[in-house]
Amino acid sequence: VVGPECMALALFFLCAAYATNALSPKIAGHFQVATTIIKLIPLLLMAVVGIIVGLVSDQGVLLENMANPGAETTGNPLFGAIVATAFAYEGWIIATSINAELKDAKRNLPIALIAGGIIIVAIYLFYYIGVAGGATVEDLMNDGATTAYLNIFGGAFGNILNLFVAISCMGTLNGLMLGCTR
């Protein structure tokens, strides 16, 4: 979807997220939990299946990718890491905006932020190892993680991946709206 249709669709989802959060924060919270769980499905599937396929495949793709990381990247990798880290911590600011609604926020919010951060790091670490088991480094650099999904799960799941990405984006929009409207 491109052009004015894209803007109309974005405006619809923005208004829907605002209306949901304004009229029923409880429903918005349940929607947030649901989208988070749905977002984890392809990540965990790729982590588990990708590692297994990468280890038992005839080509030994996972072991080859770990031994040969591919061509050097151009640019400053530290800058890319800093930008990604700053973007990741954006959610922490939003999470603290709902502390008044949490039970024993002084105790529970730091636990949630630290435990949540550790869990997300672990999930993405295993996800990227699984992706490395699904395609060669060169294929991943040229075509992205979709290649690994197509190689491991076939065409149908490779296309369903876009649905998971859309649900993830709606969850992000809802989460931002949930925190920013407070």
Regions flagged by a language model, labelled:
Residues V2-A10, L14, T36-K39, T73-A81, ...:
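Residue-level signature of transmembrane alpha-helical entry/exit and packing/kink sites
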Residues C15-A19, F79-A86, I160-N174:
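Hydrophobic alpha-helical transmembrane segments of multi-pass membrane proteins
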